[in-house]
Each structure stands twice: as C-alpha cells, then as structure tokens.
Amino acid sequence: SHSKHHATYVKGVNDAIAKLEEARANGDHGAIFLHEKNLAFHLGGHVNHTIWWKNLSPHGGDKPTGDLAAAIDDQFGSFDNFRAQFTAAANGLQGSGWAVLGYDTLGDRLLTFQLYDQQANVPLGIIPLLLVDMWEHA
C-alpha cells in the first residue's frame, strides 16, 4: 500500500538522523558521510513520494488549466510538446529515478529534468511541480 511504502522512507529518515547524531558525537567522520548519504536517499524518497501522491488522480489527469496551462503553452509551444518532452525524460532514465516538471525561480520558466534514484538532486532554485515515479516497482 502507499502508506506502508511511504512509511519505509520516514523510518529510514529517522534512523539515519539518529545514526548521524551518534557518528557526529563520536567523531566518526567515515560514518558521518555514509549516514548523510542514507539520509539524502530516504529524505528524497519521502519528499518525492509526497509530491507524487498529490499528483495522482483516481480518474486520471487531463490537461492543466489556468496559469500552468498558459506557462506550458508559452514555454513548450503546446501541451503535446510538453508531454513529448516529459515522456522522453521519463523513458530516458537509466536505472531508477523520476521525471520532473519544475519551476525555475531564477529563470522564471518551466523545466523538465530527471532525478536519479531518490537523491534530492533537484537543481538549485527549482520547485518540483509534477513527478512521475520511474522505479521498476512503480
């Protein structure tokens, strides 16, 4: 179920934080880097899935409306052009990851890009708007 899957990431975050605090208290720098990586993975999984659950619709989606529709038409030429680019980002992933539509706050524009695995490797200044889970279990 969705809640069980998501709970695994939340538990992973909490476990990584506890282990990270212990490693810092003991001055174990090698363990600090390992636990920071684990924290990034589980926190990325939590954040990515939180956005994804909100993107899902029980009856499927349709074209966006309002400001988002206007921005897509303006920046991609049409919804069909956006969908083709977004689909290419999703299908072009090597291994596990996510396809993302994000808002670039610095450039004031929409971007499509890929996230690898669960790492929170979102470019600086980007707000993820739409994510598609491309992990093999999805």
From Swiss-Prot:
Parts of the chain that traverse the membrane: none
Cofactor, free-text remark: Binds 1 Mn(2+) ion per subunit.
Keyword list, A-Z: Manganese, Metal-binding, Oxidoreductase
Keyword Manganese recorded: yes
Gene3D superfamilies attached to this UniProt entry: Fe,Mn superoxide dismutase (SOD) domain (1.10.287.990), Iron/manganese superoxide dismutase, C-terminal domain (3.55.40.20)
Record field: catalytic activity: 2 superoxide + 2 H(+) = H2O2 + O2
Domain of life where this protein originates: Bacteria
Annotated positions binding Mn(2+): 2, 49, 133, 137
Family (UniProt): Belongs to the iron/manganese superoxide dismutase family.
Function recorded in the entry: Destroys superoxide anion radicals which are normally produced within the cells and which are toxic to biological systems.
Protein name: Superoxide dismutase [Mn]
Gene source species: Mycolicibacterium phlei
